[in-house]
Amino acid sequence: EMQRSLVGSEMCIRDRSGDSLLDGRGDAYCGMLNASYNLKLRNIKAYIPEYPVGTAEECADMIHEFEPIARAIVALNDLKIISFGPRPLNFLACNAPIKQLYNIGVEIEENSELDLFEAFNKHAGDERIPAIVKEMEEELGAGNKKPEILPKLAQYEITLKDWVEEHKGYRKYVALTSKCWPAFQTQFGFVPCYVNSRLTAQGIPVSCEVDIYGTLSEFIGTVVSQDTV
């Protein structure tokens, strides 16, 4: 009986003699070791399931288990992360060396809060604001406790969407991260949490406090689960 592994074209063949290491699969274990070593020698990054050996039918089912991983790898190579501002003081957990992003195929564009503030001010009086305000009113319903702030929130949402379209370049997907405090509320005149949530629901993950790895994690979770994270 021949059993196929998911690693390239390597075959893991059951030892017909029965004189093997474990459960009649000594040759299969040896084949997996050699396949793994060959991949490493060639610097090929491969996914090996916890139980990588099976019949043709079983391996076909394993491919479905690999689909979320494949989606994530493809999507990461089409992702651009856009950040605004340095991480806040003492938010050491938000430290994100960008070299690791490039190592997995992700691009990043780092901007200052001042860049975002300038773009926001340029969107004052934008003709699209009333339509977004109406959307927000319908979405919030009885939870609309601060209706006077909705025009600014709509202005901010439009600002971010325009920035994404103008800066994503050849990348298909964008994830955002920015600061929420302490100066944001006093200078912009609102907190951005609601807009962040709306954009995330629309397929643009947003994290706060310039948590670059955080928004990356949100994006991966969205791609893998095919749902909002």
Model-derived segments and spans:
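Structural motif
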Residues: 1, 84-88, 180
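Single conserved hydrophobic/aromatic residue that forms the stacking wall/gate
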Residues: 2-8, 12
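Beta-sheet entry/capping signal
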Residues: 10, 45, 80, 107-108, ...
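Active-site loops and adjacent core secondary-structure elements that bind or stabilize anionic groups
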Residues: 11-12, 135-161, 165-166, 170
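Short loop/turn segments at strand-loop or loop-helix junctions that form parts
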Residues: 13-16, 179-181
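Cap/lid and interdomain-hinge subdomains that line or gate substrate/regulatory clefts
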Residues: 16-144
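Anaerobic metallocofactor- and corrinoid-dependent redox/one-carbon enzyme cores
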Residues: 28, 90, 100-103, 153-229
